[in-house]
Design a protein with these regions (language model features):
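NAD(P)H dinucleotide-binding glycine-rich loop of Rossmann-like/cofactor-binding domains
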Residues: 36, 45, 82-147
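C-terminal capping/lid region of NAD(P)-dependent oxidoreductase domains
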Residues: 286-295, 303-322
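Glycine-rich beta-strand-centered segment in the early N-terminal region that forms part
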Residues: 21-38, 48-90
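Glycine-rich phosphate-binding loop and adjacent beta-alpha segment
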Residues: 169, 217-288, 321-322
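Hydrophobic/small residue at the entry helix of a nucleotide-binding pocket
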Residues: 150
Length: 322
């Protein structure tokens, strides 16, 4: 089978499409024929060495497809089931072995492409809006990269929970996408200072929560956008990691809260995994949440998908199609 492998850390050019043996499922494992795999910043961080992984390895932590084989002791699924998963390396391939307890059943109304697009980013948007800072009517949130994969989903979920949404984007075209996803106000950060705009839009009060996946270039100004006792949720670092930080600043700016969450912590148990994935997939099934596929690439063009993602030229979700 074909798989995208990493032998040395570096830029997108280190990604190599290789012929490898098809894996066999061991005890508690399932063999999944991949229909679509999601492309995420965590893949970039593992490729460039920011998140160390023993090499060589097959990239990718999110996919959807069909069960084609099961190992001893598997009770959760059977051959022929449509499934999706996240948090298991090896998705940039034609087949992958996955622990059965990490699989999520796909409703008939949800396509494999939608399933692959929703696992990491959909569950991320869900835990951000429902658990990390549970949005409620009367809250105002600031969503950076509001036209990105997580951003578009987060805007929609925030509106489902009754919050006011202020989004930041880089272009007018992305602003339209964010508005279509429910953003009440959209700031073009390339033309206006987002901190000043947030203060203006909130009458100087600030927002209850900032959802920041950008990191280095937005973090400090984002703290200034928060109301007293507001929460900075730093869940990514697309522009680079945030530098050394003195917690005393949180007190000085109004007894602020700061968290650096990761989706795998929020789906550590099968109960949580099924609950979060089930809610997200249910919203899609019922037409309450829309998934935007921003681009599809064959495995041989995985490097191009990474270049698009890193250049922030994407809107919605990028997929690899084996």
């Amino acid at each position: 089978m074909k798989a995208v492998r990493v032998h040395a850390v570096g830029g997108p050019e280190v990604l190599r499409l290789e012929e490898v043996d098809r894996p066999a499922p061991g005890p508690g494992q399932v063999l999944v024929q991949i229909a679509a795999a999601g492309v995420n910043f965590v893949d970039v961080y593992q490729r460039n060495g920011l998140y160390p992984v023993e090499r060589p390895f097959t990239l990718g932590q999110e996919a959807a497809g069909t069960v084609t084989g099961i190992g001893p002791g598997v009770r959760e699924v059977k051959v022929g089931d449509r499934v999706a998963y996240a948090g298991v390396l090896g998705a940039y391939a034609e087949f992958a072995t996955v622990p059965a307890d990490r699989l999520v059943p796909l409703p008939n109304e949800v396509s494999p492409k939608q399933g692959a697009a929703l696992m990491l980013q959909g569950m991320t948007a869900q835990y951000l809006a429902c658990t990390t800072y549970p949005l409620k009517p009367g809250d105002t949130c600031l969503v950076h990269a509001a036209a990105g994969g997580v951003g578009l989903l987060l805007c929609q979920i925030a509106k489902l929970r009754g919050a006011r949404v202020i989004g930041t984007v880089s272009t007018a075209a992305k602003a339209e996408l964010a508005r279509a996803a429910g953003a009440d106000e959209v700031i073009l950060y390339t033309e206006r200072d987002f901190e000043e705009e947030v203060r203006r839009l909130t009458g100087g009060a600030g927002v209850q929560v900032v959802y920041d996946s950008v990191g280095k270039t937005t973090f400090a100004k984002g703290l200034n956008c928060l109301a007293p006792r507001g929460m900075m949720v730093l869940f990514g670092q697309a522009s680079g990691p945030v530098g050394a930080f003195d917690p005393l600043v949180l007190m000085q700016k109004g007894s602020l809260f700061l968290t650096r969450p990761a989706v795998l912590t929020y789906i550590a148990t099968r109960v949580e995994l099924l609950a979060r994935a089930g809610e997200v997939l249910g919203w899609v099934r019922d037409g309450r949440l829309r998934v935007r596929i921003g681009g599809e690439f064959p495995l041989a063009q995985a490097a191009d998908a990474h270049r698009e993602l890193e250049a922030r030229r994407t809107t919605g979700k990028l997929l690899l199609i084996p």
